[in-house]
Amino acid sequence: MKQRSLLSILCFILLASGVASVSAQTCIENRKYFTPNGTYDSNRRLILSSLPNNTASRDGFYYGSIGEEQDRVYALGMCIPKSTPSDCSNCIKGAAGWLIQDCVNQTDAYYWALDPTLCLVRYSNISFSGSAAFWEIEPQYLVLNTATIASNLTEFKTIWEDLTSRTITAASAARSTPSSSDNHYRVDFANLTKFQNIYALMQCTPDISSDECNNCLQRGVLEYQSCCGNNTGGYVMRPICFFRWQLFTFSKAFHNITLATTPPLSPPPLQRPVVASQPPSADNRDKKRDNSSGKISMKTILAIVVVGIVILIIISGILARRFARKEKPYQEVELNQTGITSVRSLQYKFKTIETATNNFSERLGHGGSGHVFKGRLPDGKEIAVKRLSEKTEQSKKEFKNEVVLVAKLQHRNLVRLLGFSVKGEEKIIVYEYLPNRSLDYILFDPTKQGELDWKKRYKIIGGTARGILYLHQDSQPTIIHRDLKAGNILLDAHMNPKVADFGTARIFGMDQSVAITANAAGTPGYMAPEYMELGEFSMKSDVYSYGVLVLEIICGKRNTSFSSPVQNFVTYVWRLWKSGTPLNLVDATIAENYKSEEVIRCIHIALLCVQEEPTDRPDFSIIMSMLTSNSLILPVPKPPPSFIPGRPNQSTTRPSSQNINDGRWSLLKMMFH
């Protein structure tokens, strides 16, 4: 049975190699280059991370920018019309990820993602909105099927040329506003035989003129004909236009379209074209190709190499699994009981951890779920070991939750999980060791808080936002932290923040905006009002917690130290803001060693985060833009919740917060450019 399965896989690979590979990203080489991990790179990553949400929520098209002067990055996202928000967001997210991965230092790049839907992502260091200078960038990735039309070629070309001609005319006509993906878009098909259609899709960016769109598409069709006119499908891509045709539907683009009437042809009804596995010989267009039966083409060589590599990988995987089965897994029953067998490769033997921590002798701190100890593995790596003290079912769930979630997360502002261990009721989580411990350990200690000057605090504010932005927009799946606080921000040797403690975190579906729980988990003072009162949590409840955290970082005091019968922490800050004295909040240990405009801007952002209504709060992509672009004008904040004893329950008066990501921030998002 296993041999048959392996044979099926290999056969599939060999068959698939008969189709040319799709590589639709273009890192433009004739422009400037940036320094990886520099300011331009950070701005590039930031604006690309915000594209999925901005594009999906804006009629399938978004253009904006972030940064200043030479570090300014312009970006565009576009989906085909009638894409679902989920399909559009996923497509843009995938395309942006490929650009970040493959275009390591190019300041200009674009990517057409082809399936399961079609979308475009482009970024540049110069503004390109409405620019049709496509001829300076040669068409990239003329991708085609290696099969060809072997009979009825004349009749086929007549139908094909008519289809592409009318599709160009329809696509280039302006039908809606320049900010809608429905502008300059058309799909159509034509009957080839009774049982076979030809399908075509054409799209231009909606911000160019009809003539520019027409010229770009016409040029693409002519280039395809001169290159690959006998093939059974293909595409031509430029930064501003896209053309594809196939003998099958694609990109979820052909639902509910009306077939335009095909002009009558003088020849008799067509027979179904014969698709040959090899290109036809003796055609002037194909003279550049090497059709000699005595020579092996480069495409064939590449296919053989790829197949060989894949076979080696499969064989290596099979051998590795066989060897792994020979070693009996330890604590198999207990591991299965935790429900985390999918990450079993991260499991340490309990004895290893016991030895590494010298029998748990050097305690670093204590949290709500247990003690944290310092250790050293046999290879010399320093580790932090969380030893869960509670034995309840809830603690088991949080243990499983944290291990499974954190094991999949990779970001410089998220703590890195190294492994775990289970022995009976003992449950251990192993993290990277961070020498400066947690933020609260330094921030709220009068003898240590002087180590955090304003520059370090500002770095912690920005780094924490980047970490949560990753959880909300860039991780798969979306994660709501639910317990963001100073004690859950760890600091490395350079005071870079790393978000930690995912025991109470929850996963959100792609289209999910809010969830309700009967057991609100979190820390009083950081919890949003809708979460405390109604059990509603969302991305915006994390935003609220972040706002409180930012204010704590500025003042150097716990939020609980400001509570009184008439006000709480956020209302105290609000009164300072309204009285025009926000700098009275600043920690005295910072003295005058700070930029007042930066501090005031951070207080302003924090007050936007702690507004009472979830829909009034910015999402983290906007927060990052506020922190990195001083030219962005901030909205006037609304009053925060007071939580004063005796206050009427808000649940009877608060409007529904089901639509967490409504349009209140759309104007601000449009200001990126």
UniProtKB/Swiss-Prot annotation:
Q: Which Gene3D superfamilies match?
A: Gnk2 domain, C-X8-C-X2-C motif (3.30.430.20), Phosphorylase Kinase, domain 1 (3.30.200.20), Transferase(Phosphotransferase) domain 1 (1.10.510.10)
Gene Ontology, cellular component aspect:
membrane
Q: GO MF annotations for this entry?
A: ATP binding; protein serine kinase activity; protein serine/threonine kinase activity
Q: Which positions bear Phosphotyrosine?
A: Y431, Y531
The portions of this protein that span the membrane are: 300-320
Domain Gnk2-homologous: from-to ranges: 25-128, 137-250
What GO terms describe the biological role, i.e. biological process, of this protein? Answer: defense response to bacterium; plant-type hypersensitive response; response to molecule of bacterial origin
Instruction: Give residue numbers for the modification (Phosphothreonine).
Output: T523
Chain intervals with Basic and acidic residues compositional bias: 283-292
Q: What class of enzyme is it?
A: transferase
* Active-site annotation: D483 (proton acceptor)
The segments annotated as topological domain Extracellular are 25-299
Q: What is this protein called?
A: Cysteine-rich receptor-like protein kinase 13
